Every structure is written in C-alpha cells, then in structure tokens.
C-alpha cells in the first residue's frame, strides 16, 4: 500500500507558497523574474518562512546588483554568513562576473576540492573564456564549492533578471558537454600535450595534464549530479515573480516555457505591487491602475490555472530589515485581505 499522501486540487492551487514550504524533499528553490518586480524581497521572505520549517537554509544572490545586503541591512559576501536574528538562515552573494583567473589559479594547498587547482596557464584561460556563459559559470562554481563543503537542507537562489537566470540554469548542461569534450581530447592527444607541457616546465602548481583532467572530471560528475537534481521536481522548483503589467506577464510566460524546455518544475507565481483602493476612492490614477491590474490578473489566472498564484499588495514603505521582511513573508503563507 502506498504511503503517498492524497493531495487535493484545492490544496495545490491555494494562493500561497505553503505547499513549497511544506515540501520537505525540496533542496533547490529558484526565485526569478523581470527586473524591478520584487525578486529579492520575495526570495528573502520565502527563505524566512523556510527557516521556520527546515534545519538549515542558505539564501544565495546570483544577481550582480546584490540586494540581499540592502534587504537585511547586513553586509554579505562570497562566504555564507548567518543572517542577524536567525540561527539557521545564512546568506551569501556570488559575483557572476568574478575573476575567472581565481578558478584557474594554481592549485597549491587546495586539498581535495575538485573546484580548486585548475592552474592551466594563459592558454587554458583563453580556452575557458571561449566557453559560452562563462560569467554564469563563475556563479555556479562558487555555489558548488559552498554546497560541497557545507550541508544546507535547502538552498534559495535570488537570481539575476530573466535572461541571465535562464542561462545560469542551462549552464550545468553546457559545462557537462564542454568537460566531456575536453576529456575526449585528452584521451586522444594527452601524451603529446604532456610532452609539450613537460618541455615548458609543466602546469602551474607542478601538476601534469592527467591530474588536471582528473580534477575536471570530478567537477563534471558533481555538476552532472546537481543537474539531475535540477530536473527532479521533488528536489527543485522555480518561483516566478511578476507584476500585473503586460511586459512582466510576457516575460513570465517566456520564462515558464523555457523552464519547461529545461525540465525544471515551476508551479508558483508571486504577483507583487497590487493596488487595492478603498471603496468609493476618488483617486482616478489608483482606480485606473487597479482596473489595468485586474485585467492582467485575470489573464494570469486563466493562463496558469494549475499554479499557486500569490497576490501581494503594494506597500506604503520599502520592505527592508528583518521586521518588515517577516511581515511581508507572512503574506506569502497567509493571503492578504484588503481592508474594506
């Protein structure tokens, strides 16, 4: 007899992110959308809710703008750091334009870290720079280093604007293919390259080509494992964030189609900055904007009838600091009810 719980459609389509918080198997949660729609506020708020239900949560920004520090009022860097006021929520900001030379630097004193020690000299650096999406590679490399050395129960990504996000998600597949090709070339031309490198003093750090390729193969296996997890809906999901306007809705639809093509699960949309004018309000601009928003909300509900669509109000103040983020995060779980 199966032990799988019976989940009713009403539960799946509730206008909250409660189902994501309750899904204990999730390890990777991406939050993304068009620029300026409230991705960082949403990802921080979701991480706060997850911290109530999980042993350890890591929030990672892969957006070059890095708004996590501003949101929490606390400086974060490329090393995971506990968020003030929490014992199980950490945050870090990965620089997607970080120095590729750091990744390709010599490997002295780096231990068994498969990410380290790719000291390959200028020739290999030029080769690495030719790989498509190399900026996103840096984010991914940094993430893998953290995930391998630290065990977090769930990881939330505050991603870059839409296009960058999708390239970042595609990168594991791209890098897998690139490293597989390098391994193939090594098996064909390895002895010849080793003799050339030997005559020139070898690779930085005293490595030979075989050692380098062993490290790259180890990296490829790690990336392959993570890529498999990304395509598993029990382990990975993507939360789309938008506002009720044409361009944002268009970007969301394009993003959902691409995520589907990458086999990445997405079943939740957060619609931010909604106006709820008081009945009898004589604010023409407010009423006109609300009318426009209602039109696009109806389209969202029609297009994504099998999604959890969360409606979030436009607030009077910026959502910054732990206290305001906690209040905002509560509305991701308990639907906002506008005053009469």
Curated annotation (Swiss-Prot):
General function of this protein: ATPase required for the post-translational delivery of tail-anchored (TA) proteins to the endoplasmic reticulum. Recognizes and selectively binds the transmembrane domain of TA proteins in the cytosol. This complex then targets to the endoplasmic reticulum by membrane-bound receptors, where the tail-anchored protein is released for insertion. This process is regulated by ATP binding and hydrolysis. ATP binding drives the homodimer towards the closed dimer state, facilitating recognition of newly synthesized TA membrane proteins. ATP hydrolysis is required for insertion.
InterPro entries membership: Anion-transp_ATPase-like_dom (IPR025723), ATPase_ArsA/GET3 (IPR016300), ATPase_ArsA/GET3_euk (IPR027542), P-loop_NTPase (IPR027417)
Protein name listed in UniProt: ATPase get3
GO term, biological process aspect, one: response to metal ion
UniProt similarity note: Belongs to the arsA ATPase family.
Summary of subunit composition and partner proteins: Homodimer.
Keyword check for Cell membrane: no
């Amino acid at each position: 007899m199966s032990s799988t719980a019976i989940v009713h459609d009403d539960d799946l389509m509730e206008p909250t992110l409660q189902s994501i918080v309750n899904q204990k198997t999730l390890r990777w949660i991406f939050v993304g959308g068009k620029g300026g729609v409230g991705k960082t506020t949403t990802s921080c708020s979701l991480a706060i809710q997850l911290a109530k239900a999980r042993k350890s949560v890591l929030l990672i920004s892969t957006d070059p703008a890095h708004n996590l520090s501003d949101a929490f009022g606390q400086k974060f860097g490329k090393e995971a750091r506990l968020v003030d006021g929490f014992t199980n929520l950490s945050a870090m900001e990965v620089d997607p334009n970080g120095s590729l030379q750091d990744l390709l630097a010599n490997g002295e004193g780096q231990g068994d870290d498969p990410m380290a020690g790719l000291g390959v000299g200028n020739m290999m650096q030029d080769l690495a720079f030719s790989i498509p999406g190399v900026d996103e590679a840096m984010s991914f490399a940094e993430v893998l280093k953290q995930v391998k050395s630290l065990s977090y129960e769930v990881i939330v990504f505050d991603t870059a604007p839409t296009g960058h996000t999708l390239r970042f998600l595609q990168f594991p597949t791209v890098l897998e293919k690139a490293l597989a090709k390098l391994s193939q070339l090594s098996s064909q031309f390895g002895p010849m390259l080793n003799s050339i490198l030997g005559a020139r003093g070898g690779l930085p750090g005293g490595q030979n080509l075989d050692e380098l390729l062993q490290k790259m193969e180890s990296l490829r296996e790690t990336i392959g494992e993570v890529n498999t997890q990304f395509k598993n809906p029990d382990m990975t999901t993507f939360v789309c964030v938008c506002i009720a306007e044409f361009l944002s809705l268009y970007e969301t639809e394009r993003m959902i189609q691409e995520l589907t093509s990458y086999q990445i699960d997405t079943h939740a949309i957060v619609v931010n900055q909604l106006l709820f004018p008081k009945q009898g309000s004589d604010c023409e601009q407010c009423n006109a904007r609300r009318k426009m928003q209602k039109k696009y909300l109806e389209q969202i509900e029609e297009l994504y009838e099998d999604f959890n669509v969360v409606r979030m109000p436009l607030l009077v103040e910026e959502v910054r600091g732990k206290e305001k983020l906690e209040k905002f995060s509560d509305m991701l779980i308990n639907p906002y009810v506008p005053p009469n």
